[in-house]
């Protein structure tokens, strides 16, 4: 159990010892298994280690999905070195009636440019469900074959099918 929790980003050191109560508290969280593909230059984010700023994991460094727009300019080189790309497939496990609110990192945000009635405007967005919304979930990233990924960033991507 400890090995899986370490790999899922539970913030446990190699010599950590958990009581049964602590282990069950970690295992009682919602879980997601995320299939990612090798980064072949497509635009977008990917899996990274992130320091959590709010919620049940404040202060911990956990594996997270980070969108390219969330990176500061001085971090763009780090993003370019990423070995894997955004999630392709996701398997989620949660308990009926389980509140997901404690597992959200509300401190994450993105500044984006959108078009509203023909004019470009800057908007503040909170990351979606698979980003900050699943921050406190137990996350496990696994590599899957690249043929599983069919990106659609624009209508032209629908034509470029190999």
Q: Where are the predicted features?
A:
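OB-fold and OB-like single-stranded nucleic-acid-recognition modules
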Residues: 1-162
